[in-house]
C-alpha cells in the first residue's frame, strides 16, 4: 500500500510553461493542483549568491556560452536565472522542497536557514518542509559540517547495499534514486536500514503509482505526470 503523504515534486519546475529552474516555471508548477512541491538545482554566482541553475554553463537553456561562476547574480538575472532568495520569497513555506546542491554554496545555507529554518521538538535546528540533496559526497559532508541536524538525501542511481551503506555513513535520512533502480527488495533493504527513499525522474502516471505503492517519500516528476 502507498504510504500517506507521498509527495509529487516538479522537476526543475514546470518546463511546459517556462524554462527549467526559472521563477516562472516554479510558479507554474505550484499552480498545478496535484503538485506538492519542487526539486531544483543550486549553483553559485561569481559574487557568492545562490542561484537556480542545473548546468555549469548557460549554453543549453539560456543559449549563452558562459559559465555560471563567471557571472554575478545581477548578470544571471538578465538571462532569467533567479536567486534562491527570490524563489523562496515568492513561494512561501508550504511547498516541499528538494534543494539539490551542485556545489558548496554558503549563500544557500544562509537563505534556507532564514526562509525555512526552524527548531524541532528536541531543540535542534532543522528545515521546514525541505531537504538538501546531492550526488556528491563532498557536498553532503560540507552541509553536515555546516548544519549537522538538517535533513540530507543522497542522490543515487540505485538502492544497492553499497549505496545504502554510503548514505548511512554520510548521515543521510533518505536516498533519492533513479526510478529504474527501485524494486520491492531494494526498498525493503533501505527501510530495514532506517532510510526512506524518493524517486526521480518519473514521466508517466503508471510508474508514479508503482513507486508510490512502494512507499516513496516523494516522486520527482515532469510534464503530464505533474498533473496527476
Regions found by a protein language model. Name each.
Residues 1-228:
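Phosphate-group recognition and catalysis centered on beta-loop-alpha active-site segments
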